[in-house]
Curated annotation (Swiss-Prot):
Gene3D superfamilies in alphabetical order: Ribosomal protein L10e/L16
Listed name of the protein: Large ribosomal subunit protein uL16
InterPro entries xrefs: Ribosomal_uL16 (IPR047873), Ribosomal_uL16_arc (IPR022981), Ribosomal_uL16_CS_euk_arc (IPR018255), Ribosomal_uL16_dom (IPR016180), Ribosomal_uL16_euk_arch (IPR001197), Ribosomal_uL16_sf (IPR036920)
Family the entry assigns: Belongs to the universal ribosomal protein uL16 family.
Pfam families assigned: Ribosomal_L16 (PF00252)
Gene Ontology BP annotations: translation
Keyword Ribosomal protein: yes
Keywords of this entry: Ribonucleoprotein, Ribosomal protein
UniProt GO MF annotations: structural constituent of ribosome
Classification lineage: Archaea, Methanobacteriati, Methanobacteriota, Stenosarchaea group, Methanomicrobia
Gene Ontology CC annotations of this record: ribonucleoprotein complex; ribosome
Length: 172
């Protein structure tokens, strides 16, 4: 089946749907790595990507943003020159009431009768001003980290803001 556009799931409309204990067939998350780079070093500058609006971010968008930011940081600073953390987890289970299309679909499908839907994906529910990504770097890689977060923000379905959490005096 074709993947639906993210605009179908972006807005938070209903109550949370996370109890996997009662569900069968929940697809696994594509996001596997939540800590990237050098996890042991202590970096003086921390930059964070914040969501400006309340929304749901699908696990595919989180993985695309993570890959983009990680690739930009790895090529510029190397594996040991940064630490990046993904701060949200896709707990929310998304459902879809599949519709049959084409000739004879009216005989096959039941329309809106029993329209609860099947589990198709997972998403992270994000509130306004919540941290999504944090990158810790040395001051010489600050511009690269900021650009990596900007690129990652373009993959997400909400407007984002980049703020410096720690080390503002070093990057002026």
């Amino acid at each position: 089946m074709v993947r639906k556009p993210a605009s179908m799931y972006r807005n938070v409309k209903s109550r949370s749907f996370t109890r996997r204990k009662y569900m069968g067939g929940v697809p696994g998350s594509q996001v596997i790595h939540f800590d990237m780079g050098n996890k042991t070093a202590d970096f003086p500058v921390k930059i964070t990507l914040l969501a400006d609006e309340r929304c749901q971010i699908r696990h595919t968008a989180l993985e695309a943003a993570r890959i983009t930011a990680n690739r930009a940081m790895t090529t510029a600073a190397g594996r040991s020159g940064f630490h990046m953390k993904l701060r949200v987890y896709p707990h929310e289970v998304l459902r879809e009431n599949k519709q049959a299309t084409g000739a004879g679909a009216d005989r096959v499908s039941s329309g809106m009768r029993a329209a609860y839907g099947k589990n198709v994906s997972t998403a992270a529910r994000v509130s306004a001003r919540q941290k999504i990504f944090t990158i810790s770097v040395n001051k010489e890689h600050f511009i690269i980290a900021k650009d990596a977060l900007r690129r990652a923000g373009q993959k997400l379905p909400t407007p984002v803001t980049i703020v410096v959490d720690q080390g503002q005096e070093l990057v002026r």
